[in-house]
Amino acid sequence: MNLLTTKIDLDAIAHNTRVLKQMAGPAKLMAVVKANAYNHGVEKVAPVIAAHGADAFGVATLAEAMQLRDIGISQEVLCWIWTPEQDFRAAIDRNIDLAVISPAHAKALIDTDAEHIRVSIKIDSGLHRSGVDEQEWEGVFSALAAAPHIEVTGMFTHLACADEPENPETDRQIIAFRRALALARKHGLECPVNHVCNSPAFLTRSDLHMEMVRPGLAFYGLEPVAGREHGLKPAMTWEAKVSVVKQIEAGQGTSYGLTWRAEDRGFVAVVPAGYADGMPRHAQGKFSVTIDGVDYPQVGRVCMDQFVISLGDNPHGVEAGAKAVIFGENGHDATDFAERLDTINYEVVCRPTGRTVRAYV
């Protein structure tokens, strides 16, 4: 029996996909499944998303794109992080769309002797991370337009402040993106399918849906903007089996450095999840776990393999083997856990690693 598990609810994934498909309306729905489907397991999750309405998939790396083809995904797949030095020809041969994120990437594709290459141009509209810069637009557009083996399917960009719906930076980026799109079309690139909406923009700015939307986090049932609810169902639960319960005397400490000491005689329990499994060491004293509907605070330093919780005088009789929910079903949700750790729910669902075993329900 596994001591540490992430339970993935595939029915929740299916439900979320249907909700997002309906919200997308006439726009195509691209599912972002990078980072092993946000740590939910792409081999199980992607087929469910495909079966319930996704028109396309987006990933970061070539390996992720190839994996989608290996598991039978037939929809369009867009890969946006690759280098000209990589063997990207194999991806082209498997009908994977490649992002043009710089003039060097454009040149590498233009110089490739493939018969047909589908590309999408990524525009840097203000995030200043990756994407073709404004001073490079004209040169890249004209070069791609002159390459007969290149099919430019569209353009996309990434929004810096979409999780702040009132931030004017989003509209400034959209103005820049539309300027790039107009220039591309002036150079003869039709760019029929364009997209700017990640999860927060998709859920809060229907005026920006364009021809396709590109949510990621929302597929896994998490809300990207605080205070906004869209009927999504969280798919991940991170839980562990209590390994031992022991008595502790008043004044005694626990874990390295004895940074926490019991005020009264009582009990502590050990939960086998440590920083080797994705539980951050700096989480000391910031969160609680839920056992049979009761919250118990984490105390002392988080160790490599385990952390400690205080049971008080253990009125509910917690014993070894009890299920401790770190976040998810019957416990605090991932967003609450993230807030306690001063981070975001995107990171939290990517944390369970190490000896955590994924189980599907």
Swiss-Prot record:
One of its GO terms (cellular component) is cytosol. Its EC number is 5.1.1.1. The active site is at 34 (proton acceptor), 256 (proton acceptor). One of its GO terms (molecular function) is alanine racemase activity. Substrate binds at residues 129, 304. GO terms for biological process: D-alanine biosynthetic process; peptidoglycan biosynthetic process. Pathway: Amino-acid biosynthesis; D-alanine biosynthesis; D-alanine from L-alanine: step 1/1. Its cofactor is pyridoxal 5'-phosphate. It catalyses: L-alanine = D-alanine. InterPro entries: Ala_racemase (IPR000821), Ala_racemase/Decarboxylase_C (IPR009006), Ala_racemase_C (IPR011079), Ala_racemase_N (IPR001608), PLP-binding_barrel (IPR029066). Keywords: Isomerase, Pyridoxal phosphate. Catalyzes the interconversion of L-alanine and D-alanine. May also act on other amino acids. This is Alanine racemase. It comes from Corynebacterium glutamicum (strain R). The lineage of its organism: Bacteria, Bacillati, Actinomycetota, Actinomycetes, Mycobacteriales.
